[in-house]
Amino acid sequence: IQTYPICDPISGVIELIADSRFDGAIMLNQEGKRFVEELERRDVLSEAILKQTGNYCWVLWNDNIGKISNTVKEHPTEYEAFTKQGIMATCPDLKCIADFTKMPLKQLESTVKRVSSMAGKGNDKDFHHRGGLMDMSEGQYYVIKAVPSTHHTMGGVRINEKAQALTAKGQVIPGLWAAGEVTGVTHGTNRLGGNAY
């Protein structure tokens, strides 16, 4: 299977509102620390999250990032549902974020200060964020709790190099070919996104 790293802890549904991650949102553990480069592959992110306290993370962004990603405006139903569910909050400052998430305020402030400093220098010394970090020194802030969840099954019919379907013993099944998501030997450790339709 492939997991998607940023999903609702209750239903397992992908949190599209947290796509702010692609525009600079950071992922924090319960201790208030970054633990992975936020644009890593889905399997790498999922594994990293599962190694954190409670097997979840918090995705944090501010209006500086929100103006780029526009996820709150693009996904108002999610915003309302996740807020009502108690896994998302909008806060004027980091103290409010710490109160909501139960992260230690001093560590949270230290992390955000470091991220903002590295953003200003254009150099993420901790995880080498390939998209570039953003200044998060001022609110308004948004935070959502997230867990990995099953996203895609990467199993299927075995095929040979000609895309001919094979029996369990590796023999060609005459007249039967397979391609895309029905195949089970082409994905490796991560789904080939171009095959998903």
Place the predicted regions along the sequence by residue.
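Residues forming the flavin
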Residues: 1-197
